């Protein structure tokens, strides 16, 4: 049996509120929980997520450290092969 008066009050039907509307109920030590984001309006879960990384990671690395692009290394090899065929 838990000791009396040392545990917080438990609310089995606490309301989770997002943008002024109740989105779900859950158990909590507070009667109302106010949240900014939940799975119903988060871009990842709604399928409206935008991908910000349009360049490849290797290309960004090559540009950052002044090595050109990853494709330039392969194009140099292709040029050498063409020259050797002549």
UniProtKB/Swiss-Prot annotation:
Transmembrane annotation, as ranges: none
Keywords: Ribonucleoprotein, Ribosomal protein, RNA-binding, rRNA-binding
PROSITE patterns noted in UniProt: RIBOSOMAL_L31
Listed GO CC annotations: ribonucleoprotein complex; ribosome
Keyword Transmembrane belongs to the record: no
GO terms for MF: rRNA binding; structural constituent of ribosome
Record has Transcription regulation as a keyword: no
Region (Disordered): 65-86
Domain of life, source organism: Bacteria
Basic and acidic residues bias (residue ranges): 76-86
GO term, biological process aspect, one: translation
Cited NCBIfam families: L31 (TIGR00105), PRK00019.1 (NF000612), PRK00528.1 (NF001809)
Function: Binds the 23S rRNA.
Homology family: Belongs to the bacterial ribosomal protein bL31 family. Type A subfamily.
Summary of subunit composition and partner proteins: Part of the 50S ribosomal subunit.
Name the UniProt record assigns to this protein: Large ribosomal subunit protein bL31
């Amino acid at each position: 049996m838990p000791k009396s008066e040392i545990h917080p009050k438990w609310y089995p039907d606490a309301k989770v509120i997002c943008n002024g509307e109740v989105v779900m109920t859950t158990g909590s030590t507070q009667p109302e929980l106010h949240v900014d984001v939940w799975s119903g309006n988060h871009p990842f879960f709604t399928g409206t997520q935008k991908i910000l990384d349009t360049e490849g990671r290797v290309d960004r690395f090559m540009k950052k450290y002044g090595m050109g692009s990853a494709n330039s290394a392969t194009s140099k090899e292709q040029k050498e092969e063409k020259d050797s065929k002549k």
